[in-house]
């Protein structure tokens, strides 16, 4: 790949610092909420996998954009993993649902092959991620975690702008 991964990350992240990873206390309830955005159906792991798949089947210009966004999502995944550790949880790719461990699945990704559908599904996924992050932030009573979530949301909003501009340029209104 031409260029550096750091350059790609810088192009698709807002450029503001991320808050330090710290929490008031270990909290399994908060960890379960964070795990949804870490490795759930609407999650950073899903976003990384979906962008990686989509960049493999698109042209160079679009490929580089999707790859750059995926790299930022990898950074978000790392942040959430560190947050899970701070909350006292192991950052495995599973969720607890009705006392069962459910592992992340590739069925969570959009398997579109048409550019229009790829961009629309990626925009939709970013919007769903923001909605999930906001719901989580409204439940959690830890300003450190909320600051981290709000910073990640800023990148997700940037991704929507980038993808929407790409859609307008490549597909039209």
Q: What is the predicted role of each segment?
A:
Residues 1-173:
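Non-heme di-metal
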């Amino acid at each position: 790949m031409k260029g550096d991964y750091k350059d790609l990350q810088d192009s698709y992240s807002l450029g503001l610092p991320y808050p330090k990873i710290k929490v008031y206390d270990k909290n399994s309830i908060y960890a379960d909420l964070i795990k949804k955005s870490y490795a759930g159906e609407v999650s950073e792991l899903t976003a990384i996998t979906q962008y990686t798949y989509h960049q493999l089947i698109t042209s160079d210009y679009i490929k580089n954009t999707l790859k750059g966004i995926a790299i930022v999502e990898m950074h978000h995944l790392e942040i959430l993993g560190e947050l899970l550790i701070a909350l006292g949880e192991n950052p495995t790719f599973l969720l607890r649902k009705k006392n069962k461990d459910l592992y992340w699945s590739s069925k969570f990704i959009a398997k579109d092959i048409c550019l229009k559908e790829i961009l629309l599904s990626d925009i939709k996924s970013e919007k769903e991620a923001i909605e999930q992050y906001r719901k989580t932030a409204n439940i959690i009573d830890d300003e450190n975690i909320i600051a981290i979530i709000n910073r990640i949301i800023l990148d997700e909003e940037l991704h929507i702008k980038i993808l929407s501009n790409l859609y307008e340029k490549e597909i039209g209104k």
